[in-house]
Amino acid sequence: NFCGGFALNAVLVDLGSGTCPIEVYMRIQDYQNKEIIEKNPNSSASIYLLGNKSSGTLMSLPSGICAAFKDYVTDRTVTVCYNSNFERGPLENLISEEISRITGERLGMKIQALDVLYSEITWDYILVLVNNKHWIAVKHVNKDKFVCYDPAEGKDSDGSTMGKAIENLRKEYVISGLYICI
């Protein structure tokens, strides 16, 4: 469950703002504990986070990743994108809560519902949720080249599309339809 922090740190390092990956993860968790679990213990997000701990760690939700990103000085804006499959998937109860947090006054970031991310990629970095529980980092190098970083094993791979780069990383990865675009 450290993957959200480690994937975000990979992007921050590439942007020249990186730090220790565990520090980034801890910023995500600090936000989630204070802004989600303590303030709204009965929310879908709190119930999900506490019910899906892995080795004592909480998953990184998009709002937590956005909050941590905002703590670092960059000139980038963040757009969280999701497709209709994700909206109706196993995390559907979290979507409306996450949208409120991400677009609210504290974070003030954008949300975009779209089903055609592959053909419209204009972002340089994308954190991609795979298998509904694991974050990987993707860098859009140029028109026909994407590089993925998997924090689980510290491996990377490339491909001519984002999907191909992820497939080259690990064939078992299924893109869930949730993207944090930077």
Which positions does each model-derived feature cover?
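Active-site nucleophile-adjacent alpha helix/oxyanion-hole segment immediately C-terminal to the catalytic cysteine
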Residues: 1-41
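Conserved active-site-adjacent core of cysteine acyl-enzyme catalytic domains
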Residues: 34-135, 139-176
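Short, solvent-exposed mixed-charge patches
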Residues: 181-182
